[in-house]
Regions:
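A short glycine-rich, Lys/Arg-flanked "PGG" loop and its adjoining helix->strand segment in the class I
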Residues: 126-140
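Active-site micro-motifs of SAM-dependent methyltransferase domains
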Residues: 99, 119, 148
Length: 224
């Protein structure tokens, strides 16, 4: 009986997530260039096979294909986002990565990119574990940093920081840079590089946990 209840709850959650992100992309509209895209492209070898999880409307995918000549696959739960990504000439698939990422065999891709994605899923650690098996060379992630100095001030004065694009319920997980480092190390990754993509450069490079607004991680499974 408990197993049937779990299945029903899981299917219900998937359905609600699907509806939420269809509306999300309709309300948000198109994305644009982001500093983190340049960081990711510097980490990715030219010609690599790349899976972009939560690819959205494909702006990053187009940037990556044009600049690194990669074999690109984008995935997203939103058909609205995927239609826009397809219009950019990208190879994309419909995928609920919080449940179905394990459809790919180990070593299927050189790199997996999760750009401002992992905070949107409830089972972040499990998704990261699976990504570590699928990626040959590394998993590239960016997260919003809840310990950014402006957010600390907002909390000090009793206000929760606004990190979302459309609605507060889109973010299910929150990390500081130091918290995320502990999380990924606990599930078997080594951190090859950390780079903040927003904020004053000299400060964000020295103290990313304080002065990095969005922070990029180059992760490698310890077995690689």
């Amino acid at each position: 009986m408990d197993g049937k209840v779990d299945i029903v709850l899981n299917l219900s959650f998937k359905f609600l997530m699907k509806i939420f992100y269809e509306n999300y992309w309709k309300e948000r509209g198109r994305s644009g260039n982001r500093p983190r895209y340049r960081i990711f492209s510097q980490w990715i070898d030219e010609g690599s096979r790349v899976l972009d999880v939560g690819c959205g409307d494909g702006y990053f995918g187009e940037f990556l294909v044009n600049n690194r000549k990669v074999d690109y696959t984008g995935s997203d739960i939103s058909d609205t986002a995927l239609q826009t990504a397809k219009s950019r000439g990208l190879n994309v698939i419909s995928l609920d990565a919080s449940n179905d990422l394990d459809r790919f065999a180990p070593g299927s891709f050189d790199f997996i990119v999760m750009s401002e994605f992992i905070e949107h899923v409830p089972n972040s650690e499990e998704v990261l574990r699976i990504a570590g098996r699928i990626a040959k060379k590394g998993v590239l992630i960016s997260i919003p940093n809840i310990a950014y100095w402006k957010f600390r001030l907002q909390l000090l004065f009793g206000n929760f920081p606004k990190q979302w694009a459309v609605a507060p319920e889109e973010h299910l997980r929150y990390w500081s840079v130091d918290d995320f480092k502990k999380t990924v190390k606990s599930i078997g990754f080594e951190i090859k590089e950390i780079k903040a993509s927003n904020g004053k450069k000299i400060l964000r490079d020295m103290w990313p946990n304080l002065f990095g607004f969005q922070v990029c991680f180059y992760l490698k499974p310890k077995s690689l």
